A protein has these predicted regions:
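Terminal-region recognition feature
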Residues: 1-101
Length: 101
């Protein structure tokens, strides 16, 4: 199983370099599509902790997950709020502790 640490703010691809420069955790649609392309249809796990972010970027990630041929699992390791819930809903299976948000 390939794993992506999905931590930080969901942002458009164009803002990725800015967030990287100021050392802010982020995930972009390109992060997701590159990860899925490298997984080559294997089952994947998104280890997620995100307070959300930009809805269009989250929608692009949701679409990429729904099109992915392998099984997509999400494990909420911190929180999943706002736009992050859109991404989470693209998974085949979501695991979340009752004490997580």
């Amino acid at each position: 199983v390939k794993t992506l640490k999905f931590n930080g703010t969901i942002i458009p691809d164009a803002l990725g370099p800015v967030y990287d420069f100021i050392k802010r955790s982020n995930v972009t649609p390109k992060t997701m599509t590159d990860f899925l392309e490298n997984a080559k249809g294997e089952d994947v796990l998104l280890s997620m902790s995100s307070g959300g972010g930009e809805i269009t970027a989250a929608s692009d990630m949701y679409t990429a997950l729904k099109k992915y041929p392998g099984k997509v699992n999400v494990e909420i390791t911190g929180n999943s709020a706002s736009a992050a819930t859109i991404v989470m809903l693209g998974a085949d299976h979501v695991a979340i502790s009752p004490v997580h948000q």
